[in-house]
Amino acid sequence: VWDSAPWPRTGAGVQWVDRIVRRFYRTGIRYPVWVFGLTIIGLGAGIPALWDVKVETNLQEFFAPDHPTRSDTRHFESIIAGTGNLDVIFETQARDGLKNPEYLAFMRSFQTWAEKLAEVDKSVSAADFIEEMHWGFNAEDPAFRTIPDDPKLISQYLFIYDGEDLFDFVDQEFQVSHVSLSINVHPANEIAAVMDRIRVYISEHAPPGLQWEIAGYSRLFADMEELLVKGQVYSLWGALGLIFLLMLILWRSLGSALLCMIPNISPILIIFIVMGLFGIWLDMATAMVASIAVGIAVDDTIHVYHGYSSRIRAGILPVKALVRTFSQAGRAVVTTTIILSAQFIILVLSYFQPTTHFGLLTSIGLWTALVFDLLFLPSILMLLAYKKKKE
């Protein structure tokens, strides 16, 4: 008749979460000056690391040093040529303009200069075909391994040559041609540095009437990296601005909106400090971390501050308002952080470095946001309440 099952115990389930929450917010309430001061000192000490964050992307570094992709690339580049590619496009306005000996001679001189760069292993252009034919039709005399001075002779060589591969380097109107450079560097910044030197050389030495531009896969990669990272940085600032605006509309108070931004900006600082300290690049993968961390962190801040402010308006004392708020919302924000960070931390097991960094930094951002909401935010609220009471 009687139910003999044991009564539920208060320590079951996720009761341990409540103990963690209490320990954090009670520390923030009891020692607000210490918590606030030590947090500011800690962030200040980490600020110099922000200048060590390097904006860089290198596809080779996305894999471990012993990964077949990297080892095979190193082997190929050691015996043949660099796998990177830059194409310098040359164009004239007139038909057959690239049969001009001056233009062809400049293309060859540019190749000679480029091949002296440590980053360039090899170069090929239409001028190589003409130079080779001029040398071959003159008994392979080394003195004739040059571009002929007579445009008519160049036309005759091209008339005789029937290889289709020539038109891989020049169009059939002989108005557009390109010099293909095989480069052995892969970081976007180093590729950009090579392109800058090429631009300087051509700008100083190109003959009048010869238009030029740099293209190729490596140029695309360098530009893509720059545009992507800049776009992500701009989107981060846009997200912060939008969050601040929504906070302002929600709380109808400039001070409250600014206050709620502190726990949301702090994870970003911590993420970039960690990146600077451990040499993690800001690349196309890690650029997304800050925006995601902010988007998730703002949810916890709204839970905490909404509960606190609504109780303050009801006439409850600040200490009791914080205690009741965390008693109600503390378990939820901690459990949410545990679940989300567990999903992201699994990515650390990946062999692909961007995925590993993405999962690690996102988890760090989530836990940082939680600590700031449970510890730093209560200390600020207590200091503000004390200041208001004193006034």
Model-derived features: where do they sit?
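Interfacial helix-loop-helix hairpins and adjacent transmembrane helices
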Residues: 1-43, 313, 378-391
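Extracytoplasmic
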Residues: 32-284, 382-391
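Transmembrane helix-loop junctions at the membrane interface of multipass transporters and ion channels
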Residues: 1, 277, 281, 343-360, ...
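Pore- and gate-forming transmembrane helices of large, multi-pass membrane proteins
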Residues: 261, 296, 313-351, 370
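Hydrophobic transmembrane alpha-helical segments of multi-pass transport and channel proteins
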Residues: 236, 240, 265, 269, ...
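Hydrophobic transmembrane alpha-helices
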Residues: 244-247, 264-265, 281-305, 342-345, ...
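Small-residue-enriched core segments of transmembrane alpha-helices in multipass membrane transport
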Residues: 257-278, 293, 357-374
